[in-house]
Regions:
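Bacterial N-terminal signal peptides that target proteins for export
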Residues: 1-10
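C-terminal motif of bacterial Sec signal peptides marking the signal peptidase cleavage site
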Residues: 18-21
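Metal-dependent phosphoester/phosphodiester hydrolase catalytic core
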Residues: 27-285
Length: 285
């Protein structure tokens, strides 16, 4: 009787172990977002969301790098790569390569931030006196190529194209804007705010913005600064990073979770030259 009881116990334990193993394989691991009801199209188990009217997140895997955006200043290159959300089993490593001596040479490898899906490359002692081709790479097939322009110090005047308020009432392309601006060939692009009007879905809206305008900054430096709608409120009076108690932001500060605000800032400003004031403000913003 003891013998049979022992065998049955072992069989029962084996079934439990096999079942647990199967369940663990069926439950993908992901980094839990530090906020709720925000950026839902891009966080947690994003692949289970319904198709968004903003942009389709489930792109072919050779297209997961949406765009790169950069500035150069004081011999420092800062380049951000924006990715579409990655599946749990996909690599989080992104590479930056320069085209030198007729070959692509990887100069830096960085880890993508799963909250917002952006990654920053920083190259110091960068030679700003000449053009250089760059390539951002993920996995075996995904890449985005562009050109880092030399510093136009030999020009008496530099030209800047300034844009703002990219309405979400029209989610179509911006081909005519891009064509006309590229014809003028400015030295610098400046987006002055409200790149997104989708208050609670910044990553999706930022990806949409990038696909609409990336041919402007694929081959020239670009400044982007967030405004009120980018961080999800009607007005933005920063007031040192204080917590706003009103959705419109009219009492000053930031209404949404500070990690959401920081995600927006990371996506839109990480590639900008180093700030004069580097210390974090209230709420870590």
């Amino acid at each position: 009787m003891i013998k049979y009881f022992t065998i049955y116990n072992w069989l029962f334990l084996l079934i439990i172990l096999v079942t647990s193993s199967c369940q663990s394989k069926k439950t993908p691991k992901y980094i839990l977002a530090p906020f709720s009801n925000l950026d839902t199209l891009s966080t947690n188990d994003w692949w289970n969301r319904k198709t968004s009217p903003i942009i389709d997140m489930k792109v072919p895997r050779d297209q997961v790098i949406a765009f790169g955006i950069y500035t150069t200043s004081n011999n420092t290159l800062k380049l951000s790569a924006q990715l579409f959300p990655l599946y749990p089993e996909e690599s989080r490593k992104v590479k930056l390569a320069f085209y030198q001596n007729n070959i692509w040479k990887v100069v830096q490898t960085e880890q993508v931030n799963e909250i917002g899906w952006s990654v920053l490359f920083r190259i110091e002692n960068f030679d700003m006196s000449k053009d250089i081709r760059y390539k951002i790479m993920h996995g075996e097939t995904a890449y985005f190529e562009g050109l880092i322009r030399k510093d136009p110090i030999n020009k008496a005047q530099i030209t800047l194209a300034a844009l703002s308020c990219n309405s979400n009432k029209d989610r179509g392309d911006r081909d005519e804007y891009v064509k006309n601006i590229n014809t003028l060939n400015p030295d610098l692009i400046f987006f002055a705010g409200d790149q997104s009007y989708d208050h609670k879905e910044h990553t999706a809206a930022w990806l949409k913005f990038g696909l609409q305008f990336r041919e402007l900054f694929r081959g020239r430096p670009c400044i982007t600064i967030p405004d009120d709608h980018d961080i999800g409120q009607g007005n933005l009076w920063g007031e040192g990073g204080k917590k706003s108690l009103r959705k419109d932001g009219n009492d000053g500060g930031y209404f949404f979770h500070p990690e959401y605000v920081k995600m927006v800032e990371r996506a839109q400003t990480a590639h900008l030259p180093d700030p004069y004031h580097k210390e974090a403000l209230n709420q870590g913003i």
